[in-house]
Amino acid sequence: YVEGGVIYRNTQDYIKRDLSTVGGTSYGSYTNHGRVETKGFNVSLRYSYSNWFNLGGTFNNLDTRDKEKKRAASSGQNALTYGQRIPNIPYQYANVDMNFYWHNLFAKGNTLTFGWDCFYQHDFPLYWESFGDPSTKIRVPQQISHNLSLGYSIRNGRYNISFECRNLTDEKLYDNFSLQKAGRAFYGKFRVYFGK
């Protein structure tokens, strides 16, 4: 299947979380923007072949901008950020996943699943783009991460064993506040379903 969507949002009293530094200490604060406009689109694709393979992905593009012309209604001062993209918000990102299934492997009702997924995020500014020298701007960098998973389901899902490798290539990944996430990690899980 293929599906898509268009996004338009006119937000009044948009509250944005900021990251501020005073004397070497960072802290979060909140700023109210009178009006913020978001325009964008998303596309999803998914292909399945029989009951043993599927491939899919999504792409998202969002443009979130400050639309408050005055700093405060009573001040009459023009807002320096009018028309600028709201900082610290990813605006372009995508993911792709692929899964293989081997049904009735070793016994009827057992399934082996192998999966791969990839996440992409375009770089984005941590602070307002028009403030300061463009050559010294702090940006949350572009990110690409790959994950692998292997699972074995026994007796139609009553028992499940799974292993996962997150961030397979050990890339440097960051959250919205440019704080580095954990590197390559391995996980294992055993689950028993006690229902009927």
Model-based region annotation:
Residues 14-22, 62, 66-75, 125-133, ...:
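Outer-membrane beta-barrel translocator domains and adjoining extracellular loop/strand segments
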Residues 23, 41-47, 189-193:
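Noncatalytic linker/hinge segments flanking ATPase motor cores
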Residues 25-27, 62, 68, 77-80, ...:
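Short, intrinsically disordered/low-complexity patches at protein termini
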Residues 1-3, 48, 143-147:
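Short, mixed-charge, low-aromatic patches
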Residues 1-33, 37-39:
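Membrane-embedded beta-barrel scaffold of Gram-negative outer-membrane proteins
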Residues 6, 10, 25-31, 81-84, ...:
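Residue-level signal for pocket-adjacent positions within structured domains
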Residues 8-11, 31-125:
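Gram-negative outer-membrane beta-barrel transporters
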Residues 84-196:
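Conserved C-terminal beta-signal and adjacent last beta-strands/turns
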